[in-house]
Amino acid sequence: MSTHGLQVQGISKRYGDTVALADMSFEVHPGELFGFVGSNGAGKTTTMRIALGVLEADEGQVLLGGRPVDLDVRRRIGYMPEERGLYPKMKVGAQLAYIAQLHGLSRAEAADAVHRWTTRLDIAHRVDDTVSALSLGNQQRVQLAAALVHDPEVLVLDEPFSGLDPVAVDVMSHVLVEKCEAGVPVIFSSHQLELVERLCHRVGIVRAGHMQAVGTVDELRDRGTTQLEVHAPGAAPGWADGLPGVRTVGVRDGRTVLELLPGADDQAVLAAALRTGPVHSFAVRQSSLTELFREVVAA
């Protein structure tokens, strides 16, 4: 298995007066799951299509292992588009074998790969059905099999979990983790931010064609504000008002949620809470990726 990483270096793309991408740069390392998140129209799909070589960037380049993406490199990429990219009236098995052979596998190698991946994705019993006869979830499984059937050196997946039931989400998650553990760089976009937070090593947040933030979830948390949750049952409303660098966000499950600006003293907050009576809990609240995403795109 290749240990090549995927490098996106300063790519820009315009459509007339519309800027789709502006100096988009990031890297997906070998054996890394990279989550690519952003609102609709932020530039995720355009970036992925340029990475695959389907679209040409106006500026910048995409490299796999230091080599520009040409026809030979494209054959080594597994791509799963958000929209269905399969022939609806063609049988599943024949279609996957055809795709495998397009990527350079022999007829026998393609047959073995089709059997392996349809079994792994629990669709082996549907290989003689047409794609149009399948549920949307099973069509999504076939689409993933099409991205995997040629044993790619990098995976680029656009909304791979869309429309899947929880069992299918687990199957697909396990497959992506396995490919990652084998050294494959995996990038996928998703609006299911809880899933991205659970699976990904690093996350890139895109807004209006720009990479706004990139890093581990913990690194993204360090960029934002710190929140405290304080359970002081005897405290009157507004008990933290006036503390330097402290803003009351609200009350959640009986606990006061406070936002600390840089330089604020959490021990001063604890002392103020203790002056109101017993303090049952006092803890830093970890922001979810969904909350971090809102902070970044609203900045």
Residue ranges of predicted features:
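ABC transporter nucleotide-binding domains
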Residues: 3-6, 13-207, 213
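C-terminal coupling/interaction segments
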Residues: 3, 261-299
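Short, flexible helix/strand-to-coil boundary loops that buttress conserved ligand/catalytic motifs
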Residues: 73, 221-224, 296-297
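Structural motif
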Residues: 84, 244-247, 277
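ABC transporter nucleotide-binding domain
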Residues: 171-260
